[in-house]
Amino acid sequence: MGAEYGCLPSTSQALYVILLIVLVRMSLVFVQFPKYLRCYRCLLETKELGCLLGSDICLAPPGSSCMTLLIKNSSSGSDIMVSDCRHKEQMSDCSYTRSSPVFGFWIFSRCCLREFCNNPQNRVFYIP
């Protein structure tokens, strides 16, 4: 009689096999999701007061970047910053310096490709 049961797996072995199959399938599902870049988002920020409207996190899809705009008033020296995600279709204007339509203001744009690279502790501006 013992030989008859030697070929059949025990209940615990069957459960382990099922659990292993489920875990392998779950890991394959998670591998298929693209990795999003996490960026700092603040729509109105000054160096003196920080983020005025509250900050949060945005997710940039693969091939996209984090971005910070610096709007500089050349006469008063006050700076306003906007930080957000930049989709790959919009990355043509990632690094530029141009005058604003408003006299005396300049706009500097900078993109970066690391996690939270545009948050206040990590960002560096190269301003002429």
From Swiss-Prot:
Keywords in UniProt for this one? Answer: Disulfide bond, Glycoprotein, Secreted, Signal
Query: Is this entry keyworded Glycoprotein?
Result: yes
GO molecular function ontology, one term from the record: identical protein binding
Could you tell me the superkingdom of the organism this chain comes from? Eukaryota
Q: Which residues are glycosylated?
A: N73
* Quaternary structure, from the entry: Forms oligomers.
What role does this protein play?
May have a role in hematopoietic cell differentiation.
Name by which UniProt lists this protein: Lymphocyte antigen 6 complex locus protein G5c
What species is this protein from? Canis lupus familiaris (Dog)
